[in-house]
């Protein structure tokens, strides 16, 4: 049973402010949403369950019940999830404001406790203090948070998350910020709250408090393509595809970590709520995470035998060849940019092999084939450079003045010629390892310049950033026929 969810349900009834702030989709009428098998904690209601993707950032962090309100931790509206979200440097004052917000929304005094106990005892057979009947009173104030890093910005989503040892398939990791605050000060806050509870409930409260306030922070996770909506991943092969997201917005102050202070001024809070509206954004899929996914898929479909072949057609246009024909039914080939990169990389590699090694036909079994498997995934820089070095060494370079050279006297297509001229200024007849690396990088960077790409898509930007980019029309990609270089 989700403690935070129960606390919101019961405390929502005590006043007008709580009724507005503690309204959760999981406690209201359920509206169906796409079912998924991603396990983790819903950031909105803090329960561990199956998650669906958020309409604000396309990541999996909301349950199918809470998704009806479309709340995202990156919103610009002072809903409870946003007020519990802190960013980058979190100070002791910020945490004091958070504790004050918890104390305001979930007050614990004799009057409140007696009221909840009396309401519970009106039901049949509920005269005893059983934990499940008073779960809402057993939520301690902790500085437990789920954290994520998105392109240099670190976000902390505070809450009370049960069962921390459960399966977590999200990019969020548990972080404990109690040391920034003060353990003894937080102990005092909770012991005071606990003193109003019946003795039979105090032990359970104490156990929950210490288990959630003394844990060791987890190592931060890396965001990967699997953390985003499957609907987005299935459309990445379309260069003109745009992600459609919605954000809840209002005239909220630019002081990100100060949003939780709004509950101290009820009139100011409701005035800001009056400005609430939804903004829609059309976002490009261009980012390192999605680009690497496409290049990895293409890498699994590589037919390395082409680099020793005599085919007159480009690598993706070879048909009826047992060793060189690719499986064109995969949707990754619908992206003409991936096909261009594949064709030009293998055209260049074939020219290198034909210039330096005596190999006559694509049916021959060569050791160099093993080196070509990772040649498209330039995002994994170390592994990619290792592959290029192995290919270069296979060509049996000649050493001259402490520099190794290979020949380059085989024909290449016009696209590769243009890359040669742009990258090293001419069409050479000998190449160094550095030249080969530069040329192959240029072939890929012409379409996917990963050096200057964001790691995650712009769906993970704050509303302020999205608005600035929208003003300059930069939230959408270039026309599908234009490369990064152009």
From Swiss-Prot:
One Pfam family in the UniProt entry: Rota_NS53
Chief place of localization: host cell
Sequence motif: pLxIS motif, positions: 480-483
Residues covered by region (RNA-binding): 1-81
Effect of residue 42 to A: Complete loss of interaction with host CUL1 and CUL3
Region (Interaction with host IRF3): 317-486
Post-translational modification: The C-terminal region is phosphorylated by host CKII/CSNK2A1. Phosphorylation of the DSGXS motif is essential for host NF-kappa-B inhibition.
Region spans: Zinc-binding domain: 42-79
Alphabetical UniProt keywords: Host cytoplasm, Host cytoskeleton, Host-virus interaction, Inhibition of host innate immune response by virus, Inhibition of host IRF3 by virus, Inhibition of host IRF7 by virus, Inhibition of host NF-kappa-B by virus, Inhibition of host RLR pathway by virus, Interferon antiviral system evasion, Metal-binding, Phosphoprotein, RNA-binding, Viral immunoevasion
Keyword Metal-binding attributed: yes
Annotated stretches, region: Important for cytoskeleton localization: 82-176
Gene Ontology biological process: symbiont-mediated suppression of host cytoplasmic pattern recognition receptor signaling pathway via inhibition of IRF3 activity; symbiont-mediated suppression of host cytoplasmic pattern recognition receptor signaling pathway via inhibition of IRF7 activity; symbiont-mediated suppression of host NF-kappaB cascade
Subcellular location: Host cytoplasm, Host cytoskeleton
Sequence motif IKBKB-like degron (ILD) motif, residues: 479-483
GO terms assigned for molecular function: metal ion binding; RNA binding
One GO CC annotation: host cytoskeleton
Subunit annotation: Interacts (via C-terminus) with host IRF3; this interaction leads to IRF3 degradation. Interacts with host IRF7; this interaction leads to IRF7 degradation. Interacts with host CUL1 and CUL3. Interacts with host BTRC.
Function: Plays a role in the inhibition of host innate immunity by inducing the degradation of key host factors required to activate interferon production such as IRF3, IRF5 or IRF7. Associates with components of cullin RING ligases (CRLs) including CUL1 or CUL3, which are essential multisubunit ubiquitination complexes, to modulate their activities. Recognizes the host NF-kappa-B regulator BTRC through the presence of a DSGXS motif in the C-terminal substrate recognition domain.
UniProt domain comment: The integrity of the zinc-binding domain in NSP1 is important for degradation of host IRF3.
Record-stated family: Belongs to the rotavirus NSP1 family.
Name listed for the protein in its UniProt record: Non-structural protein 1
Source taxonomy: Viruses, Riboviria, Orthornavirae, Duplornaviricota, Resentoviricetes
């Amino acid at each position: 049973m989700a403690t935070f969810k129960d606390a919101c349900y019961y405390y929502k009834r005590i006043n007008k402010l709580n009724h507005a702030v503690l309204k959760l989709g999981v406690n209201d009428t359920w509206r169906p949403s796409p079912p998924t098998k991603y396990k983790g904690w819903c950031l909105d209601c803090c329960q561990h369950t199956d998650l669906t993707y958020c309409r604000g950032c396309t990541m999996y962090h909301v349950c199918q019940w809470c998704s009806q309100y479309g709340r995202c931790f990156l919103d610009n509206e002072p809903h409870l999830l946003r007020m519990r979200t802190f960013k980058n440097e979190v100070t002791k004052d910020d945490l004091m404001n958070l504790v004050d917000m918890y104390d305001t929304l979930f007050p614990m005094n004799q009057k409140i406790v007696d009221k909840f106990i009396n309401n519970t005892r009106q039901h049949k057979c509920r005269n005893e203090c059983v934990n499940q009947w008073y779960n809402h009173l057993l939520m301690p104030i902790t500085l437990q948070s789920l954290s994520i890093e998105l392109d240099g910005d670190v976000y902390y989503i505070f809450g009370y998350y049960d069962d921390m040892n459960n399966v977590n398939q999200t990019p969020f990791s548990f972080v404990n910020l109690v040391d920034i605050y003060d353990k003894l000060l937080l102990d005092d806050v909770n012991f005071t709250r606990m003193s109003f509870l019946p003795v039979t409930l105090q032990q359970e409260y104490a156990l929950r408090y210490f288990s959630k306030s003394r844990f060791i922070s987890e190592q931060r996770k890396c965001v990967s393509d699997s953390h985003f909506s499957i609907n987005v991943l299935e459309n990445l092969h379309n260069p003109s595809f745009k992600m459609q997201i919605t954000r809840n917005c209002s005239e909220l102050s630019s002081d990100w970590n100060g949003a939780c202070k709004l509950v101290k001024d009820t009139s100011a809070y409701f005035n800001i709520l009056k400005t609430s509206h939804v903004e829609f954004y059309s976002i490009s899929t261009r980012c390192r995470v999605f680009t690497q996914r496409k290049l990895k898929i293409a890498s699994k479909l590589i037919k390395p035998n082409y680099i020793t072949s005599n085919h007159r057609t480009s690598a993706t246009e070879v048909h009826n060849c047992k060793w060189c024909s690719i499986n064109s039914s995969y949707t990754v080939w619908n992206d003409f940019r991936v096909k261009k990169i594949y064709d030009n990389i293998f055209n260049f590699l074939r020219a290198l092999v034909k210039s330096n090694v005596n190999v006559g036909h694509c049916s021959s079994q060569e050791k160099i084939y093993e080196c070509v498997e990772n040649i498209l995934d330039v995002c994994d820089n170390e592994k990619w450079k290792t592959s290029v070095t192995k290919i270069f060494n296979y060509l049996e370079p000649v050493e001259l003045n402490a520099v190794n050279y290979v020949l380059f006297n085989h024909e290449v297509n016009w696209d590769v010629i243009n890359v040669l001229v742009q990258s090293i200024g001419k069409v050479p007849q000998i190449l160094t390892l550095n030249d080969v690396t530069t040329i192959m990088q240029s072939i890929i960077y012409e379409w996917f310049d990963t050096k200057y790409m964001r790691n995650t898509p712009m769906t993970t930007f704050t509303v302020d950033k999205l608005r600035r980019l929208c003003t300059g029309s930069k939230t959408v990609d270039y026309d599908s026929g234009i490369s990064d270089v152009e």
